[in-house]
Amino acid sequence: MTKSLVSGVVFWMSVAVAMKAQVANPYLQLMEKAGEHAKAHDAEVPVLSPVDATILGGAVPVKELQAKGFKVVPWTTNDPEKMREQIRMGVDGLITDRPDLLQQVLKEERASAKTEEERARLARFDVSAHRGGRGLRPENTLPSFESGLDQLSTTLETDTGVTTDGVSLIWHDQFLNSESCRRADGASYTLENRVFLKDISSADAQKTFICDKVHFGPDQKNDLTLSPVAVAFAKKEGLISPYVPTYAAQLFRFVKFYVEYYRTGAGKNDAHAQERAENASRARFNLETKLMPEGITTDEAHKNHTVGPQKFVDALCGAIVKNGMEARAEVQSFDFRTLVLVEEQYPKIPTYYLTGDPKLLSGLFVPEQLRAAGTK
């Protein structure tokens, strides 16, 4: 081979390597760096939780991620056929507002499974009830979590903020949204006089607000006759309503109460008592820190009006540890600063990397520890 030919081969090989680097999959890059960081701190292997459109569109390399040891659990799928498509693509679970529909699709897929391997995979499939399963009950309330458990969801997915007293309060927005919540005293409550979680104590939140409004669709019900466990638990806890904003530690107590309700309590003779108690006794909690990466938007309505990553970790992971839930809880976030801190400070608690637009998986939106080589 001539010197010029060798030089040419070397040149084009370098071009090929450079091109490959340019088109490297951002989800794979992120999880490889996240996996390295977790391993360095003896933390659990992180999980990728991408928006379902990036799974269905082929942007997320599901099989390649799984081959490297990373589970893939997309959000938020409510259409049965899209559920079925992703199940057949091999995802490890799905986050959904309609766990009832997902369970039906899974039942059909399990019945048609051809191999033991496929049956085993489907038996492990994670049914994660988004905000408790808001398609059936007012979101992120005790009745929604009860409904999620009634549907035999294997995970309760929810959101958290931090109150003035450092409590991990459960709510999706950084403020108590008037679309879902009303004031218990009947006073007007709108977007204009909204209350941010960082500006109220957990006790005052439970005295002031009732979040029983329905607005998600015709199947979302706020009929308390459908939520006997939440009603009994609210009475036990001295709450003004089962629909008051709840918090992480209280949710843990509620699920324990749910198990006891169906094992030895008022629901022990229910036709579904045994399966409900058994499922709830091992149900997991996927708790999001509602914090966005700094600089992701300059829109005042979407800026962070909450505490910083460390206070989120202190409140949420503190509640998880205090209640002995490290083996059943995970922390998820779009703000990877939170997840880095969890891996460093609470290595027994798994982390879920929430992703949307792949353009946000590079640059300043990603903590330095998780950036691919050469990324600024």
Language model region names:
Residues 1-4:
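Positively charged n-region of N-terminal signal peptides that target proteins for export
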